[in-house]
Each structure stands twice: as C-alpha cells, then as structure tokens.
Amino acid sequence: MKITRQKHAKKHLGFFRNNFGVREPYQILLDGTFCQAALRGRIQLREQLPRYLMGETQLCTTRCVLKELETLGKDLYGAKLIAQKCQVRNCPHFKNAVSGSECLLSMVEEGNPHHYFVATQDQNLSVKVKKKPGVPLMFIIQNTMVLDKPSPKTIAFVKAVESGQLVSVHEKESIKHLKEEQGLVKNTEQSRRKKRKKISGPNPLSCLKKKKKAPDTQSSASEKKRKRKRIRNRSNPKVLSEKQNAEGE
C-alpha cells in the first residue's frame, strides 16, 4: 500500500514539475486543520513528508493561520505548536488578519508563482484550490498523507497550453529568463540606476517682474499733517501771570 501511494505521488509530482515548474524544496503551506490531523494521527511531518514526496520539503504557514490558532484556544494548542515550528511566509494581510483558509487561498493567486502546495483538511478550501490551475493539494486520510491528483481545472489548463491557446506561468518565466541572458531585456534595477534626474529650469513665476506699488495719497497726506511742527509759546511765564492778574482786576 505504501509503495502504491509513493508511485501515485511520484506521478503527480512529475505532472506538476513538467507543466508548472514545481521543484525542490517543495514548499508546503499548512493550515490549522492539517496540523491538527497530523497531531491526532501521530504523523511526524518533518520526517515523513520528505520520504513521501521523495525530495526536500519546507513546512510553511502564514501569520493569519497562527493568529487563527491562537484565537481558537486550548483545544488546538498542539496544532499551534506544530504551526509555530514552520517557516512563516509573508501574506498580504499584515495589518488586518483574515481566516486561515482565505489567507492560504490568496497565497496561490495569479498562477501560484511560488509553487506552493496547500495542505488542508478544510473541504471548502480544497474545492476552491482545485479551481486554481497548478496548485498541488495535500490532505490526511486514515492517518496517512496523500498528494491529490491534478484537478480537472488543472488538466484543462495544461491541454489549452499544449494546443497553443494559453501560455503557462512557467513558460513566461523561462522566456523572460532567456531574454535577460541574451540582453534583449534590460534589468529594471540597472535601468533605474541609469536614470538621472533632469535639471529643471527656474520657476517661471519667479521670473516675473515685480509690480511697482502705486503711492498711497491718503497715507502721504496724513504723514504731511503729522509732520507739521507745533508752535510753542516761548514768552516769559512771569509776564503771562501779570497779564492774567490785570485782566482779573
């Protein structure tokens, strides 16, 4: 039974390797349900996964999965310990965490460029993963790990590529790599370094001539009035007092 499982796994891996560029080390994205099933089945993932897939593997998860396991409490404490030992891959939900299934689904968008495997016991997530071409799916049944066969969506995609209707992501990457080797496509980083900041001319608004202010007639008139000198009476104070006394008599 074990030999037949490995034969099926080898066949499925060859399909994904030839058509989608899946290669070692195989990156296995685990969610909380898969970790819990491995714990109950006493499956040593780090030891048994490389033997089953016949190659080097990397156990991975996301922050959203870890956050979800923390919120679920003590019932999934063992699954959380397994997930914490995995490599954490960056997901687009750094500020606002989402559910583990939604997060893993977002990690395999746009043709699964990082060649992730999705390992889950969630049936709803499995159905959604099967609708995305080129995503290997793993699950645990009867305490044994299984690599699912390519989904009908994946097989239809490969047939469309073979007939020339579509171009796979793997082919796009290989074409781009060949162009870069032949110098047909310049490296974006080098082109950015070569770009220099253009010397900009002076601000046209600063070149305008300053308008002369018209003289303010009212202010000038008030200034003239203010400049008039006050005539002081410089007569002798004694004389003034005598005049005032005479007038009083």
UniProtKB/Swiss-Prot annotation:
Residues 180-249 are annotated as: Disordered. Transmembrane segments: none annotated. The keyword rRNA processing applies. There is a cross-link at K179 (Glycyl lysine isopeptide (Lys-Gly) (interchain with G-Cter in SUMO2)). Pfam families: Fcf1, UTP23_sensor. Residues 224-235 have a biased composition (Basic residues). GO terms for biological process: endonucleolytic cleavage in 5'-ETS of tricistronic rRNA transcript (SSU-rRNA, 5.8S rRNA, LSU-rRNA). One of its GO terms (molecular function) is mRNA 3'-UTR binding. It comes from the Eukaryota. The modification Phosphoserine is found at S174. Involved in rRNA-processing and ribosome biogenesis. This is rRNA-processing protein UTP23 homolog. The gene is UTP23.
